[in-house]
C-alpha cells in the first residue's frame, strides 16, 4: 500500500510521515532535498532553474514510485509525484518562471511516467496557514528557503486547495 502525505512547504509532512511510520511500523519514504543539486540555485534565480529543478524532482519521485511499487510494505511518502506537476510546475508556469517549451517537455515526461505507475492508494492532505508555514520554515533554518516569499506560499496554498478539491 502506498500512502502519500501532501501539503505546502513547512506544513509538517516529514513530521507526520515519521510519526505514522513509527506508530504503525510502516516504511517511510522521504523527499530528498539534501542531495538536490538545483535547490539552492532555484531559490536564488527561480526563472533560470525551474525546469532543471522540477525535472530533477520528477526523476527522483518517479524512482520513488517505482521502488514503492516493488515493495510489499506499507509505504508512507512525504510529497508525491503528483504535487510536482499539479502544484509546483503549475505555479511556476503561471508565474512566468517556465517557458511553454519547457512546460510541454516536462508534461510529456510526466504523462509517460504516469502511464507506467499508479497514484497513491491513499492521500493525506496537510493544510496550514501561510503565517504557520513561514514560522515552520524559519524554525528549520534551511538557508535556501529564506528567500521564499509569502506570495509564493499563498499561491501554493491556493493550488493545493484546488487540486485536493478535484482529486
Q: What are the language-model segments listed below?
A:
Residues 1-2, 72:
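Pre-Walker A (Motif I) flank of P-loop NTPase domains
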Residues 13:
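Conserved lysine of the Walker
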Residues 8:
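P-loop (Walker A) phosphate-binding loop of NTP-binding proteins
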Residues 16-17:
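Post-Walker A alpha-helix
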Residues 5:
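Hydrophobic anchor at the beta1->P-loop junction of P-loop NTPases
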Residues 86-159:
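A glycine- and Lys/Arg-enriched "phosphate-lid" helix/loop adjacent to the NTP-binding pocket
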Residues 58-75, 111-115:
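Short amphipathic alpha-helices and their capping/turn segments at secondary-structure boundaries
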Residues 22-60:
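Conserved substrate/cofactor phosphate-moiety recognition/catalytic segment
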Amino acid at each position: 500500500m502506498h500512502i502519500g502525505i501532501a501539503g505546502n512547504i513547512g506544513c509538517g509532512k516529514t513530521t507526520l510521515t515519521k510519526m505514522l511510520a513509527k506508530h504503525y511500523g510502516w516504511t517511510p519514504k522521504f523527499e530528498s532535498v539534501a542531495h538536490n543539486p538545483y535547490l539552492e540555485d532555484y531559490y536564488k534565480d527561480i526563472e533560470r532553474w525551474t525546469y532543471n529543478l522540477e525535472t530533477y524532482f520528477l526523476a527522483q519521485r518517479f524512482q520513488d514510485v517505482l521502488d514503492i511499487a516493488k515493495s510489499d510494505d506499507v509505504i508512507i511518502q512525504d510529497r508525491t509525484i503528483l504535487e510536482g506537476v499539479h502544484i509546483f510546475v503549475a505555479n511556476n508556469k503561471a508565474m512566468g518562471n517556465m517557458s511553454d517549451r519547457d512546460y510541454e517537455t516536462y508534461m510529456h515526461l510526466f504523462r509517460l511516467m504516469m502511464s507506467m505507475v499508479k497514484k497513491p492508494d491513499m492521500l493525506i492532505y496537510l493544510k496550514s496557514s501561510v503565517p504557520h508555514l513561514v514560522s515552520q520554515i524559519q524554525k528549520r533554518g534551511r538557508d535556501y528557503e529564506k528567500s521564499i516569499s509569502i506570495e509564493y506560499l499563498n499561491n501554493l496554498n491556493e493550488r493545493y486547495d484546488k487540486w485536493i478539491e478535484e482529486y
